[in-house]
């Protein structure tokens, strides 16, 4: 897939892959661009390369979820072969965005087990995610479920 990236995409691809392989500190990137410029294609390429890297390391469990591919809508999630933010992070679609409702202990433990090994998060179509959804719902759910056990190294918002 890397061969199909343009020069700027390749530069970004290799930069992120280098960071994934060499740094233990969390890093955050926001990648923007108009419709049809290849952001989702870049996500797919980075996902494949990072997954190959993580699974090649000694002692890695192939069944653990290491990378989240998230999007705000089913159509966007389908486009990157990922899942919706709501379904992955157990955020009810009917819930008021301004009020965060923590999960009960059983559901939270299930989510922690499912996402405990996550190292990399891609959030596609970030422009469709409102400030309240991002800061109240996503941020708090990640703090409750993933960040309390092991902080992912990388977040890419596209």
Regions found by a protein language model. Name each.
Residues 1-158:
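Conserved ATP-binding/catalytic motifs of P-loop helicase motor domains
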């Amino acid at each position: 897939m890397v061969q199909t990236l343009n020069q700027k995409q390749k530069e970004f691809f290799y930069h992120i892959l280098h960071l994934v392989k060499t740094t233990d500190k969390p890093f955050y990137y926001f990648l923007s661009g108009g419709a049809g410029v290849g952001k989702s294609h870049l996500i797919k390429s980075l996902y494949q390369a990072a997954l190959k890297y993580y699974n090649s390391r000694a002692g890695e469990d192939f069944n653990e979820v290491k990378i989240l591919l998230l999007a705000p809508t089913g159509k966007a999630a389908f486009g990157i072969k990922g899942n919706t933010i709501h379904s992955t992070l157990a955020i009810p679609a009917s819930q008021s965005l301004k009020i965060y409702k923590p999960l009960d202990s059983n559901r939270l433990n299930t989510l922690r087990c499912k996402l405990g090994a996550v190292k990399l998060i891609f959030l596609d179509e970030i422009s469709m995610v409102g400030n309240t959804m991002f800061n109240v719902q996503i941020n708090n759910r990640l703090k409750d479920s993933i960040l309390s056990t092991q902080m992912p190294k990388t977040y890419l918002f596209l």
